[in-house]
């Protein structure tokens, strides 16, 4: 510790000494500059000489301009001429003949002995004011009359010549004391630091001028410009992702390929809660009416909501796009319209479009490439389109030939082109027995079929229907439910055995029923629920697995290969709010449910959703057993009826 303290004290003393040296050096420099300024002020220019030089230069320039080379000057400067007490700087001769070339003084005679016969001597006349020049080279002696000029002594500092080359440069000689030399040696290590400080000062001086302050009018113009709104809408989503997690927040949903997830989300056969989607502003006091997952971006899900009675000034219909990939708590996109959205789906083959069916009967189309939250297209409220609530919207077909199919509760089915929603391409009245319109509450197309479909009605009856052909309209009738059909879904898993003829329905009669289009009676009735069953859906990857939700907030998963009496897995949400909708994710590993409070619950299914190689054959045997049991029960019923 003592060594460190001594070292610090020594450093402090050196710093103080350096500061004193700098101050002393600065003071001496200021005194030297002051003396030089005083000497410059005492100096006076020679008006005669300067005027003469100026005239000589003008004459030489004039002669050179007309092509005549000027002769050497007839007057040569003399350094000093001492004769008793006389001092001469210049000898100004009277006009002489052009043969005279130069003059010299006795003081310079010694240095000019080697100049040959052209040297001249200076002699005094009887008149002290006249000087005679005599040339040894001339044959005759000729006298030149000279005049005496006023002499003023001036000392000029020599001009400093700086040449930029690799040779060593030496400044003008300056007298320095030994103390100054020691000071410079002590300060020398700090030269680099001082140069850095000087560079920093220069950089600060050369900084750009501060930007001009915008006026309020210019600020408002920028805030309301379309470019700013598009930039702000895009940037705020990126910032929300960055605040939520450290994933690839710059992923763009406008056309880049999806990065597939690796590995299973959850191992095990039980349902585990993953996350919840809820927005305090847009979800509060609204009921989840429909949900759909995107085919192009499997992590995106859209949900539609009914009106909020506590906020009459808010839009009645809302559709929110949620993102499973990022942990942010706000929706990816917010869409709304002036009527409650009863059904919603992503437009297949158009990853940027979202289709919604409203309570007023309008079909609305949103585009996430537009910065507007309102629909970019909508159908008219006219007799040619829907005038009743639309609970069914679906895009069917192929990439090059597809249509939007919508059905309203008055039994009217319309086919639309997504490029033009002003008028439907075709429409059909779903009427039973040519007089009774079908109040459709649900619609489903079998996998790979765009012509035949099944619908559920408010009366509890299920119908098959056809879009084209001689049997267009309502076909078969399936009776079995004792209440309105709330959900209907066709078998979706594709495998070695085709089960596309199967479909399931849910109803207010607390049951879920399994059907086949080959028979108008239910194959099986699942009666484990104690409240309204609001929705049902097959797993997209497992042939024997489906999910259903009821009014008690319970989510049930049924694996028919394991058991047909009780659910394989079941979970009740917190608060026991009624669950209105259920939707499987495209990979079949997650299932989403929406409740009556506007919340969406995401559950991981785990290995329960992963099918084994023998699942299709096992499910075929299960169906055979179900048919056999149904046949036995029908025979027993017939015997009892006969008895």
Curated annotation (Swiss-Prot):
Residues 1-65, 96-123, 167-219 are annotated as: Disordered. Residues 2-123 are annotated as: Interaction with DCTN1. Its main location: cytoplasm. One of its GO terms (molecular function) is dynein light chain binding. GO terms for cellular component: axon cytoplasm; cytoplasm; cytoplasmic dynein complex; cytoplasmic ribonucleoprotein granule; host cell; kinetochore; microtubule; nucleus. The modification N-acetylserine is found at residue 2. Keywords: Acetylation, Centromere, Chromosome, Cytoplasm, Cytoskeleton, Dynein, Kinetochore, Microtubule, Motor protein, Phosphoprotein, Repeat, Transport, WD repeat. High levels seen in the brain and testis, while a lower level expression is seen in the liver, spleen, kidney, lung, skeletal muscle and heart. The keyword Repeat applies. It is found in: Cytoplasm; Chromosome, Centromere, Kinetochore; Cytoplasm, Cytoskeleton, Spindle pole. Residues 1-13, 20-60, 187-219 have a biased composition (Basic and acidic residues). Residues 145-161 are annotated as: Interaction with DYNLT1. The modification Phosphoserine is found at residues 50, 100, 107, 111, 177, 195, 633. Residues 96-107 have a biased composition (Low complexity). WD repeats lie at residues 283-332, 336-376, 385-426, 435-475, 480-525, 528-568, 574-613. The keyword Repeat applies. One of its GO terms (biological process) is transport along microtubule. The modification Phosphothreonine is found at residues 105, 174. Pfam families: Dynein_IC2, WD40. Homodimer. The cytoplasmic dynein 1 complex consists of two catalytic heavy chains (HCs) and a number of non-catalytic subunits presented by intermediate chains (ICs), light intermediate chains (LICs) and light chains (LCs); the composition seems to vary in respect to the IC, LIC and LC composition. The heavy chain homodimer serves as a scaffold for the probable homodimeric assembly of the respective non-catalytic subunits. The ICs and LICs bind directly to the HC dimer and the LCs assemble on the IC dimer. Isoform 1, isoform 2 and isoform 3 interact with DYNC1H1. Acts as one of several non-catalytic accessory components of the cytoplasmic dynein 1 complex that are thought to be involved in linking dynein to cargos and to adapter proteins that regulate dynein function. Cytoplasmic dynein 1 acts as a motor for the intracellular retrograde motility of vesicles and organelles along microtubules. The intermediate chains mediate the binding of dynein to dynactin via its 150 kDa component (p150-glued) DCTN1. May play a role in mediating the interaction of cytoplasmic dynein with membranous organelles and kinetochores. PANTHER family: CYTOPLASMIC DYNEIN 1 INTERMEDIATE CHAIN 1 (PTHR12442:SF34), DYNEIN INTERMEDIATE CHAIN (PTHR12442). Belongs to the dynein intermediate chain family. This is Cytoplasmic dynein 1 intermediate chain 1. The lineage of its organism: Eukaryota, Metazoa, Chordata, Craniata, Vertebrata.
